[in-house]
């Protein structure tokens, strides 16, 4: 249901190594269609998904994903990629709805692997300590 929380083990993942000052961690995310209880005119199916790794979005096996459902997740994804305070709602809430009220499509944002990124690999502005 909407508002169910992520499992504790996904929330409390700890980094294994000490990060350099120019490094940071992001979760890889999978956004999966969890339920559809209305008329989805974009032919989405339960189980349809996309992945976010770093700043790159991909869909398995060249599959399609509804633009309108996708756009409803975009503002949340950068915050879901990061570790937040345990009481922050971004740590407990994982469901997003399609903006089409007749579709009644619910997606779930799952955290996958935790990856380490280097500042200079993802920004044209060089890291200065």
In which residue ranges do the predicted regions lie?
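Acidic, aromatic-enriched beta-alpha/helix-loop junctions
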Residues: 48-88
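N-terminal amphipathic/basic-hydrophobic helices that include classical n-h-c signal peptides
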Residues: 1-12
């Amino acid at each position: 249901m909407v508002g169910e929380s992520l499992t504790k083990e996904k929330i409390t993942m700890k980094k294994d190594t000490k990060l350099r000052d120019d490094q940071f961690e992001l979760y890889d995310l999978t956004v999966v269609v969890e339920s559809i209880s209305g008329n989805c005119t974009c032919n989405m199916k339960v189980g349809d998904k996309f992945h976010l790794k770093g700043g790159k979005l991909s869909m398995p096996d060249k599959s399609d994903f509804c633009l309108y459902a996708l756009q409803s997740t975009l503002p949340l994804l950068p915050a879901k990629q990061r570790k937040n305070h345990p009481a922050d709602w971004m740590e407990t809430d994982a469901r997003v709805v399609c903006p089409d009220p007749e579709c009644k499509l619910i997606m779930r944002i799952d955290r996958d692997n935790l990856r380490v990124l280097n500042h200079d690999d993802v920004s044209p502005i060089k890291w200065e300590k």
